[in-house]
Amino acid sequence: MDVRQRLAVNMKRLRKERGWSQEALADEAGLDRTYISGIERVVKNPTVTVVERIALALDCRVGNLLD
C-alpha cells in the first residue's frame, strides 16, 4: 500500500469514527467536498499543507494519517 492509499484509508476511518460525512470534514478543514472525495478515492495527490489541515480538522497528528 503506498502513502496515498494509507492516507485515504486512515482519513476515511477517522472521519467515520467521528460520524462525519465528507462534507463535514471538508467544512472543518476548509476544503471542498469533492477534494476530500478525490483523496479518499486516491485520485488526488494532496499537498503537505492539505494533509496538515485534514489532521487538524480530525484532531490527530499528520503521522496518524500516514501510518
Place the predicted regions along the sequence by residue.
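DNA major-groove recognition helix of helix-turn-helix/homeodomain DNA-binding modules
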Residues: 49-64
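A detector for short, charged/polar N-terminal pre-domain segments
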Residues: 1-6
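Short basic helix-loop element that most often maps to the first helix and adjoining turn
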Residues: 9-28
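Conserved hydrophobic/aromatic packing and binding residues within compact polymer-binding modules
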Residues: 11, 25-26, 36-39, 65
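Recognition helix of helix-turn-helix/homeodomain-like DNA-binding domains
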Residues: 30-45
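Conserved amphipathic alpha-helical interaction elements at protein-protein interfaces in regulatory
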Residues: 13, 17, 45, 57-60
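Residues within helix-turn-helix
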Residues: 23, 34, 46, 52
